[in-house]
Amino acid sequence: MIMTELRDLVGKPLKYVPTRSFVESSFFKALSDLKLNQLKLNTDTVSISGFMNHPKNLTKFQDYPILNLDFSSFELASSASSAASDENVEYKGTLLNVNTIEEFKAINKSDLLKQWGSLIYKSITEGDTTYRSVNQFFVLTFSDLKKYKFYYWFAYPSLQSQWTVKECKEAPSFEDETRKYLDTQEELEFFFAREQEEFCGLSKFLNGSKKVNEHSTFVFVDSCRHPGLYPGWQLKNFLYILARQGMREIRLFVYRYDGTSIMMKLQLDSIPNDIKFMGWERTKDDKLGPKLADLGSLIDPIQLADQAVDLNLKLMKWRISPQLNLEKVAQQKVLLLGSGTLGSYVARALMGWGVRHITFVDNGRVSYSNPVRQPLFGFNDCFSDEGLGRWKAPRAAEALKEIFPGVNSSAYNLEVPMIGHPVENEQSAKANYETLERLVDENDAIFLLMDSRESRWLPTLLGMAKNKLVINAALGFDSFLVMRHGTTTNNLGCYYCNDVVAPSDSLSDRTLDQMCTVTRPGGALMASALAVELLVSVLQHPEGAEADAKEHSFFGEVPHQIRGFLHNFSQTKLYAPKYTHCSACSQPVVDSFRSQGWDFVKNCLNDTKHLERVCGLEEVQREAERASEALLEQAAGLDLSDEEWL
């Protein structure tokens, strides 16, 4: 012990070492989650906790009391258990998070400190002298979740009482007795008394009958190792308690585990009549002001992107749509059959809604005409080592990961078996069928986005047989159709329910303008957007895919069909019931598929008449022919009767 340091304390006002905060980045991550998902626009205070190193574990570098906060600060505050241990000491805290930086700057800091300090004063007046109540901390924050900047300012409110150091010396024997007493305690006490060879808690001492005398000594367990031997800030409120009790002179033993303990005699300069508070933390430049944690450069870019993707979605729940179930949307596994114009735009819209699992299916290559209409492809995708364009599905999956690495995108270079196109290689066709069936089983929602009408038949049948949510989008030159197929329990029709013949080959013997997708470019964007929005609206409905077309949810309507027309810029919502003899979703077709599987599909691919016989369209056609013949006969009979008048 350097005697010069002891002499420097005598005859001067007692000084205290201010507390400093150390906030780990995990605390701000937890704060951003709390703000985004729970607090939203609410500015109610939140209970938190912090911790300091146990006094016996202080190092020579801890010359200031250091309050630590991390992600557990929120968890510990909400649990009944304490974080106190042989390693750390827990402190109670309160967080106030405001909504704007202007509010953070404009709030009256003096009034706020007084408001917070009054809570400590109330605890003292009610007889609660435990360190957790006497030395609470508070923090004012503003969270800029878009830029990942966090403004914060800690406060450690202290009630003012001025004391002068009259004597200062070492007390080895008292230090030994104090150590022995602390070793017997299950939980650390930071401030207690010793009277007539007996240690006791402060509240017990103050509530006892004994008066303070020359044998009374108060003990403060210090939480820092300042080279000037000044005690930590936590002592101030304990000394105020003594001053409030009318004590004018006291003996104070500042105990430190490193052997630098000192015994002081203190004298109160004046009776604290007015209640005054101090305690805003200063910056490293010793100025009053908040701190800034800019985590944008520290967070892993992929994690940063993951949080940013969800930010705008979660902001919807703050004011506009608090009931929105984003988790249900994000958990959807979506199968996109078609990776061209519609597939590209649908995938982008799905990612915008937070969907993370997207699977592409296509068997085409990127051509030079594609990139301007299909945003997942670029010029370099139009050629490869083979001299041909890259396969669309794998390239689309790669492009999604380039846009957002957190997406789980996969691809299958697969030719969907098409009705009206006889099977040429049964082994290959069956393998494609089995892969498609497995993909339908593994996914929750299926989008039909192919170029041809007949390629949608098998996915439509699979979706109905397996009761999946199927969204269909189709383009005309200046029109489009977006619809959701019915399920096994509702009465909504599918893409084929208005047909009286089975789908047939629409690709053979076509001119160039018939082979290419000749549409107004904006139609694909509109149809894709409506298709994804229809999916989300259905998911928000309590009945999901089973919802009737006329029903509403808090998120709006869930129509059956939306037909758009660009020539007059109009849209029409339509409803078409399930057709008893539909070639794709009627019960006879579904039952035949469930019982025969690939054999049924193969027979339909090879002979559309077989499908018409199963679903009943063949009989419908016969009835139509008989009705037509009857009308002709009737018309012929009328003509003969007319001749009688000639």
From Swiss-Prot:
GO terms for cellular component: cytosol; extrinsic component of phagophore assembly site membrane. Pfam families: ATG7_N, ThiF. InterPro entries: Atg7, Atg7_N, Atg7_N_1, Atg7_N_2, ThiF/MoeB/HesA, ThiF_NAD_FAD-bd, Ubiquitin-activating_enz. The active site is at residue 516. GO terms for biological process: autophagosome assembly; autophagy of mitochondrion; cellular response to nitrogen starvation; cytoplasm to vacuole targeting by the Cvt pathway; piecemeal microautophagy of the nucleus; protein modification by small protein conjugation. Keywords: Autophagy, Cytoplasm, Protein transport, Transport, Ubl conjugation pathway. Its main location: cytoplasm. It comes from the Eukaryota. Gene3D superfamilies: NAD(P)-binding Rossmann-like Domain, Ubiquitin-like modifier-activating enzyme ATG7 C-terminal domain, Ubiquitin-like modifier-activating enzyme ATG7 N-terminal domain. NCBIfam families: E1_like_apg7 (TIGR01381). Belongs to the ATG7 family. PANTHER family: UBIQUITIN-ACTIVATING ENZYME E1, UBIQUITIN-LIKE MODIFIER-ACTIVATING ENZYME ATG7. Homodimer. The GxGxxG motif is important for the function, possibly through binding with ATP. This is Ubiquitin-like modifier-activating enzyme ATG7. It comes from Meyerozyma guilliermondii (strain ATCC 6260 / CBS 566 / DSM 6381 / JCM 1539 / NBRC 10279 / NRRL Y-324).
